[in-house]
UniProtKB/Swiss-Prot annotation:
<keyword id="KW-0641">Proline biosynthesis</keyword>
<feature type="domain" description="PUA">
    <location>
        <begin position="285"/>
        <end position="363"/>
    </location>
</feature>
<keyword id="KW-0547">Nucleotide-binding</keyword>
<keyword id="KW-0418">Kinase</keyword>
<dbReference type="InterPro" id="IPR001048">
    <property type="entry name" value="Asp/Glu/Uridylate_kinase"/>
</dbReference>
<feature type="binding site">
    <location>
        <begin position="178"/>
        <end position="179"/>
    </location>
    <ligand>
        <name>ATP</name>
    </ligand>
</feature>
<keyword id="KW-0028">Amino-acid biosynthesis</keyword>
<dbReference type="GO" id="GO:0004349">
    <property type="term" value="F:glutamate 5-kinase activity"/>
</dbReference>
<keyword id="KW-0963">Cytoplasm</keyword>
<dbReference type="Pfam" id="PF00696">
    <property type="entry name" value="AA_kinase"/>
</dbReference>
<dbReference type="InterPro" id="IPR002478">
    <property type="entry name" value="PUA"/>
</dbReference>
<dbReference type="InterPro" id="IPR036974">
    <property type="entry name" value="PUA_sf"/>
</dbReference>
<feature type="binding site">
    <location>
        <position position="19"/>
    </location>
    <ligand>
        <name>ATP</name>
    </ligand>
</feature>
<dbReference type="InterPro" id="IPR005715">
    <property type="entry name" value="Glu_5kinase/COase_Synthase"/>
</dbReference>
<comment type="function">
    <text>Catalyzes the transfer of a phosphate group to glutamate to form L-glutamate 5-phosphate.</text>
</comment>
<feature type="binding site">
    <location>
        <position position="146"/>
    </location>
    <ligand>
        <name>substrate</name>
    </ligand>
</feature>
<keyword id="KW-0067">ATP-binding</keyword>
Amino acid sequence: MTTNQQNAVVSQPQTVVVKLGTSVLTGGTLALNRAHMVELARQCAELKKQGHSVVMVSSGAIAAGREHLGYPALPNEMASKQLLAAVGQSRLIQTWESLFGIYGIKIGQMLLTRADLDDRERFLNARDTINALVANDIIPIVNENDAVATNEIKVGDNDNLSALVGILCGADKLLLLTDQKGLFTADPRKDPNAELIKEVKTIDDTLRKIAGGSGTTLGTGGMATKLQAADIARRAGIEVIIAAGSAPNVIFDSLSSEPQGTRFLPCEEALENRKRWILAGPAASGDIIIDDGAVNAVVGKGSSLLAKGVIKVSGDFARGEVARVTNSHGKLVARGISAYSSEDLAKIAGKHSKDIISILGHDYGSEVIHRDDLVVIQE
């Protein structure tokens, strides 16, 4: 590492979440690339030596399981993936333990599912565990618990999981390492004129269209999921970097003034803790479709959502559960905790607040979603 690199790195201690995808850990093969993994461990160790904290979100359990079992021919279904994850997770963590041991660093394993993030108390318990590991100079290595997770309780990919982990531990930076150099103006594998986007201040529909499709055969995340993760994290005040995992010193350079890859600047006004949980934790149980006037009030003015602005309700959710708020064209504009069940809300949609008690026979307040329980997604 050069003197210029060392001088460029911020001196104030920071917490960095490093997400390693399957393609990074395998180098595009079907097996874990231990030579590359030890280099990644070395870079994390270098960060810790400089006084920073590191939290790792590591894919690779399924790849490790497939390698250990001799690449069996299994049907491409959840039961097969759970089998491979059950076999491979222990192999993966053993590999990380031995590699970090070279640098005298202890690790701790955390396996999470969506259910751990949906429930506020379990969310806080997970946060406390990660913070305790970090405080005791241990690197948490997090993965989704694929061996038991079903579609209903899966986060779905480790890109989004890493954003949620970043919120859990109050990270300063989230580094999403992939097999690409960053986000390009077009798919660089198909378009030779594609250019790397160095910095992003706002994530809009144009960027989402550029991000496009899915990931590799062994992995579950493509550039689109990385953009989703970046959007979640930056709203919580976390700077996000998408970069190539194979690039020299890419982890250490994430703290420099000119990091490799694509840098996503955090939102100027970071969400408070409760709203971070609403954004990161609960899976939405249904949709509340609102009219243009309500969109303007919620997004433009930061107002609470009233029944008058609700067009209709989709899905089934109870009072106190999180729902998606969309405009009349189905575009997501917010997430929030509904004061009314979907059944009740369907009855009072489009009605004045003063009429709620006469319609339902009870009243939980004039707001369908109070602004303190509402997180605006649209920018």
